[in-house]
Each structure stands twice: as C-alpha cells, then as structure tokens.
Amino acid sequence: MRHGERLDDLFGEWYSYCKNKNGKYRQRDLNMPPDLSPLNRPLGEYQNDTALTVLGHVLAQMVGRAMLVSGRSPDMVYCSPALRCIQTASVAATMTGRPFKLRIEPGLFENFDLYPDKKPKFVTVEELKHSGFNIDDDYTPYCKMEDLFAVSESNEMYNDRVQSSLQYIANKSAPGRGTVLVAAHASTVDLAFGKFHSRFLKEPRQTTPENLMNISIPVPYSSNVTFMRNSDDDQWQYIREALPPITYRNFSNRLNHDFIERCNAAQQ
C-alpha cells in the first residue's frame, strides 16, 4: 500500500513556520498533528522526511480496519524507512488488533531523483524504539540503510532495487506463513504489480521515468494492490479491489486501473 496523506503535500515547508517562540513545533491547522511527540527530532529533519497529517493517520486506520474485517490482517509488516511509511504501517497494523513488529526495508525507498539536494535524514531504529514503535531487531534487510544514496541510481537500478526487495520479502513469506503488509510509496505499488502479476512472469514490467511523473495521481494515498500465492504452483494471483475503497467528496484512494494494469511500461 501507499502511505497516507503527507504534511508537505498540503502545507509545503510546514517545518519552517510551524514554530512557537521557543522554536518548538506548533500546530497551525487541525489537519496537522497536535504535536510530534514522542519523536524528538529537529524540525529541519522533516524537510526530506515528512510526517503524516491527521487525515493521513485516519486513512491508514481505515485500511487497517478493512484488512481486519476482510480476514486479511497481516502476520508480517514491512515498510520503507520514510517516516510517513513507518507511521502508515504501524497505524494500519495496529487497527487489526494483531501483535506485530515493523520490519524496515531500505530497499523499498522511492527513487533518488526526488531528492536532488541531499539524502533524507531518516529516523534511526533506536529513536523509533524509544518513541514506542515496535521494531523487529532480528530482521536482516535486503538493502542496508548505508547503501541508500551511496551511488547515483539509474531508473533501471531503481526498478531492480525495489522489485528485488519485494521478491526478498516474498521469499521470506513461504506458502502457509500468513499475510504480509508492505507500506511504502506510490511507485512501490506500481512496481509490485509489475513484479507479481502473472502476465509478467518472464520479465517484470518496468516503471519508466514517464510513469513516475505524477504517479501520485493514479496511485493515490493509501491505495493498494493485493496478491495471493497459489499453493499448487507457487505463482501469484492478483485480487482486484480486495479491500473496499475509501471515498470522501473529491477524494478516493481507488487506483486508476488503466494505469496500474497496463501491459507494458510505455503505456501511461
């Protein structure tokens, strides 16, 4: 699934003006978090690693509730190291009522060219644990955190990193080992479809730079795709709209199926 609504999409450089006279965070809109605790990080660190809005949390809660009532509560939870993805994964999984530990997979992080100025300063595992997030210390990720941004990454390298990370996660969840939730980015949802759909068995579908432009429109906040592994042949079956969509006035988290189900990377 894609993460929920992010603060900077609505409020721009919120971290620069949401301050009180002491330089501490101050809520200036009711869709902003009342406070940023229990995380204790400088506001400037949110510049390239933003948080969820209040409604972003609500969207994640709705998806988690849908997983619960549809019998798809996760047994394992993976997420990108971006804070908004960590928050989304934690909130959605909490709503299902099952115990869980977050497995942070740096290989799921979005394309580097969205960060031309500098690498985001991610919240560390120690900071997350201190803030109450239940992190799986025993998880060995496909991609190490220090390897992110270590080299310039082409679009082909980006596709391979994310799809290989998804395959790594799938390999850890053998048939009969339960349901997996992956919370990451809009492009991750698209790359998951291109990796696991049966029509791409011989060669995964690539997501092109053209596809990545404005991908947040066809893959909106908290949208998701669901695949089920067939026990007889170990292949994946796509379940269209396995979870009910979320619709409110001019917003819906429903995927643009013409985009997500396109046959090749060239189609928009």
Predicted segments with their positions:
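GST-like fold's C-terminal all-alpha helical module
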Residues: 158, 166-171, 178-184
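Histidine-centered active-site/metal-ligand motif
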Residues: 3, 84, 185, 245-251
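A generic secondary-structure signal
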Residues: 62-69, 164-172
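Acidic, low-complexity terminal tails and accessory targeting/binding regions
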Residues: 7-19, 30, 98, 110-129, ...
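Short glycine/proline- and acidic residue-enriched helix-loop micro-motifs
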Residues: 41-51, 132-156
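Conserved beta-strand termini and adjacent loop/short-helix elements that scaffold enzyme active sites
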Residues: 1, 105-107, 239-241
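Active-site-proximal alpha-helix that buttresses catalytic centers in soluble enzyme cores
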Residues: 1-100, 104, 159, 219
